[in-house]
C-alpha cells in the first residue's frame, strides 16, 4: 500500500466533491456535516457513479435508481437491506488528506 494525497485540507468544506481513480478504483471524496468521506464512486446496486447523487443528513442517494446509503458506515437505507457502499479510511498527513491503497 502507498499513501495517495487527495486534497489539501484548506479546500475541504461542506458540499465538496471530487472524483479520483487510484489503482483502477473509482473514488469519490466528499464532505458533508463537517466530515470528509471517501467512498467507492460506484453504487453497489448497479455500478452507477455516485458523483451527482444527492447528499443530505449523512446519506448519499444514487442518481440512477434512488438507492440510499449511510456515509458513516456504508449501510443501505433504501430500499432496505442490500449491498453496502464501500468506504475507505482517510489519512491526515500534514496539510493534506489522502488514502493508503
Task: For every predicted segment, state its role.
Residues 68:
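Short helix-to-coil "ATP-lid" hinge immediately C-terminal to the conserved N-box Asn in the Bergerat
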Residues 43, 62-65:
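Short cysteine clusters
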Residues 1-57, 71, 84-101:
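N-terminal pre-ligand scaffold of iron-sulfur
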Residues 57-63, 76-85:
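Short cysteine/histidine-rich metal-coordination sites, predominantly Zn2+-binding motifs
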Amino acid at each position: 500500500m502507498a499513501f495517495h494525497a487527495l486534497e489539501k485540507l484548506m479546500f475541504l468544506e461542506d458540499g465538496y466533491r471530487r472524483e479520483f481513480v487510484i489503482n483502477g478504483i473509482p473514488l469519490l471524496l466528499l464532505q458533508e456535516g463537517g466530515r470528509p468521506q471517501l467512498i467507492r464512486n460506484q453504487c453497489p446496486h448497479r455500478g452507477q457513479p455516485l458523483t451527482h447523487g444527492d447528499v443530505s443528513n449523512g446519506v448519499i442517494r444514487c442518481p440512477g435508481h434512488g438507492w440510499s446509503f449511510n456515509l458513516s458506515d456504508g449501510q443501505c437505507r433504501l430500499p432496505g437491506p442490500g449491498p453496502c457502499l464501500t468506504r475507505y479510511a482517510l489519512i491526515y498527513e500534514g496539510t493534506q488528506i489522502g488514502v493508503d491503497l
